[in-house]
Curated annotation (Swiss-Prot):
Note: Carbon 2 of the heme B porphyrin ring is defined according to the Fischer nomenclature.
Recorded metabolic or biological pathway in which this protein acts: Porphyrin-containing compound metabolism; heme O biosynthesis; heme O from protoheme: step 1/1
NCBIfam families for this protein: cyoE_ctaB (TIGR01473), PRK04375.1-2 (NF003349)
The protein's name in its UniProt record: Protoheme IX farnesyltransferase 1
Catalytic activity, reaction form: heme b + (2E,6E)-farnesyl diphosphate + H2O = Fe(II)-heme o + diphosphate
Lineage of origin: Archaea, Methanobacteriati, Thermoplasmatota, Thermoplasmata, Thermoplasmatales
Entries under CDD domains matching the protein: PT_UbiA_Cox10 (cd13957)
Gene3D superfamilies for the chain: UbiA prenyltransferase
Compartments in which it is found: Cell membrane
């Protein structure tokens, strides 16, 4: 009984270590990428969709595992992260590293088995960008690290699409950039609240390096670019007027919160923007999925 309990606790620790609150969204946007690529519910397409789902899940978990391994010293300093499984000692450094490596390699391997070579390339690029470019090279060196690191968070859309089809379309790339512009808004608005933590850990996040005013303007500019790439699919003819209407309604609070943040840069204003924009990407992709499924059924 004790062994079973210890085993379950260890599994739970590794699951928390993988940061499911982060990778579930990556898996979701990858799933939408796959759904957009299909025009029927044929069995082989559903199988490829499941392959993309598994690949994006294991790849995202692996990437989070490796970035957490790289950030272990920083996480042990920051109040917000010191109780995570690795800095708290729930899992070993060796176990954490192997967890990340095995899942990352598996995510590429499963795509290669099914001969999804372009999707495998995108998976490799996403992992390389997240683990090496963002976490290892840039995170502790520049406040703009999240911009280049944003590529990795957007790759699941392309992986989802190109696992299911080889057909070229602009829509997955538009959604790719939509995700890219959402990431700085999401990360920087939260970092504004915890900038003292980042300062103590020696991480030059944008809110740590720049003034309140410049930080607020930068975050708000990213918010406007996010809205722009949200409406582009309509003007390119990918979705109907209903999509545009919903996006415009969802975007109004972003504009209001962004303007208020610029007028009065405070932690409260930053968190309002963070709390509202956090589910924004999920809403947009969910709308896209519903519209496309309706089109397939027709």
């Amino acid at each position: 009984m004790n062994k079973a309990y210890m085993y379950m606790n260890k599994l739970r620790a590794y699951f928390i270590y993988s940061k499911p609150q982060v990778w579930w969204l990556l898996v979701f946007i990858g799933l939408i990428g796959s759904i957009l690529a299909i025009n029927s519910f044929k069995s082989y397409l559903i199988i490829l969709l499941l392959v993309a789902l598994v690949a994006n899940m294991t790849g995202s978990m692996g990437a989070e595992g490796l970035t957490n391994y790289i950030d272990r010293d920083m996480d042990s300093i920051m109040e917000r992260t010191r109780n995570r499984p690795l800095p708290s000692g729930e899992i070993s450094e060796k176990g954490a590293f192997l967890f990340g490596i095995i899942l990352s390699l598996f995510s590429i391997f499963i795509l290669l088995i099914f001969k999804r070579y372009l999707a495998a390339l995108f998976m490799f690029l996403g992992l390389f960008d997240n683990v090496f470019i963002y976490s290892y090279l840039l995170k502790r060196r520049t406040p703009y690290s999240i911009i280049l690191g944003g590529f990795s968070g957007a790759f699941p859309v392309l992986i989802g699409w190109y696992t299911v089809t080889d057909r070229f379309s602009w829509i997955p790339f538009i959604l790719f950039f939509l995700v890219m512009f959402w990431i700085p808004v999401h990360v920087w608005s939260l970092a504004y609240k915890y900038r003292d933590d980042y300062y103590r850990a020696g991480v030059p996040m944008l809110p740590v390096v720049y003034s309140d005013r410049k930080t607020a303007v930068s975050i708000s500019l990213s918010s406007m670019l996010l809205i722009l790439f949200s409406v582009i699919p309509y003007f390119l003819g990918f979705f109907n007027y209903l999509y545009l209407l919903v996006i415009l309604i969802l975007s109004v609070p972003i504009v209001i919160y962004s303007v208020n943040f610029i007028k009065k840069p405070t932690k409260k204003a930053s968190m309002r923007l963070f709390i509202y924009t956090a589910p924004y990407l999920t809403f947009v992709f969910f709308i896209v999925m519903i519209i496309h499924i309706i089109e397939i059924i027709k």
